[in-house]
Amino acid sequence: MKRKLLVLLALGLVMAFSTSALAADVKFSGNFYAAGMYQDKTYSIKDYGNSTAFYYQRLRVRAEFAVSPSLSLITRFDVMERAWGAPRIDPDNFSTFIGDVDSAGSISENENIAFDWAYIRYASPIGVFTVGYQEDLAWGTKFADWSRPAGKIAWAYNFGGVTLMADVAKLLELSSTAKLQTPWTDADIDKYSVAAKYTWKGGEAGMQVFYLRNAATRGIADFKSEIYGVIPYAIAKFGPITVEAEVDYYWGNLADDDTTGYKLKMDSLGIYIDALADLGMFYAGGTFAYLAGDKNLIDDINNAGTVTMMAGGKDWMPCLIMFNFDRTYWAGTIDAPIPDFGIMYNAWFYQGRVGVRPIPALDLGASLSYAHADKELFPGMKKDYGWELDVTANYKITNNLSYMLGVGYLWTGKYWRGDETDLDVQDNYLVINKLTLTF
């Protein structure tokens, strides 16, 4: 009899714990888009390259499991991120090794299903702690942001309008593990940062300071990188006008060779300013951005940084063709002696834009942009990236469903031909239409 009671008690405990777990609140949100793109040229040099046209889609789902008011598990995953009918990428693609550019999964996994986030959020009396794979490499405005998941431990504490933050992130690990046997020790990329932000009714301002240590290549070439950065920003609203600005300043050793003692220093600056006047039916705005180029290609100071360490980032996409990461991700690099990877680098950028909302559901916009290089990559080369005119129409079909049609035309500059000055460039244009569902 006692044994039966113990069995019943054990079953009761299992049921109790199971019921508690099943009672956790689950909240889902996300978006789905399906789009079609036509790009007239895949090469910037005259008489080279062809056109391309295709459809593509992605489903992104965020799920939050609320275990208690102060404790939750948060996940995010992407499903069927692929071009319709296109060949699937080789599962052994290099992204299997380092992950897709904006995902914790590989390109092959994203074509099926890839989890990007899985982390615990605990709101304690001394601050909010988050532990696990979560968003990183994004701060302030969208300028120079890369929004990529990383394994991270983060802390944030809010009092009044002030938020204090600190985190440590593992961006890459090449030390020996069960999945990858290597002879290297301490071969990884780590990032440490502290930040503070103040929020008020009309805006916010903050500053982040970080230290990035890249020792991933020490087993191949005996050097490492140690980069420091400071990123102040502000976003403020003055009546109908919204202004945002950000400064990115990086310094340190881009390459520090342990064997020879050689050091390549980094000293680079980026500036971003944007203003938008929203007058109800009409709006107008402008953008200025600057990213330093290298003053002297043969000295021991790099003023331009790297494409990932001092660039416009993938989140900031001011045009449909020029400096647009999404276009590059789906249609690929626009080839030339200097390829266009869709990321602003070594450039001055200027844009003016206007728009009208004839009815609440319809937004018609147009922008004119111009960019030129800050410094020459080769003696005597031209600096102009080109002029671009973009026209877009966004129509809100329902509260959760919208349709966008955009046309961009690029008067290609001669920068892309590099030092091959005998080549002629060719203009390019793009047409995109996109259906987006949010939930």
For each feature predicted by the language model, list its residue ranges.
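Short glycine/acidic-rich loop motifs that flank beta-strands on beta-rich extracellular proteins
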Residues: 216-219
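Internal, well-ordered domain-core segments that constitute the primary functional module
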Residues: 128-200, 204-206
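Beta-barrel outer-membrane channel/assembly domains of diderm bacteria
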Residues: 3-133, 153-160, 164-166, 199-203, ...
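Short catalytic/ligand-binding loop motif for oxyanion handling, primarily in non-cytosolic enzymes
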Residues: 83-85, 138-140, 174, 294-296
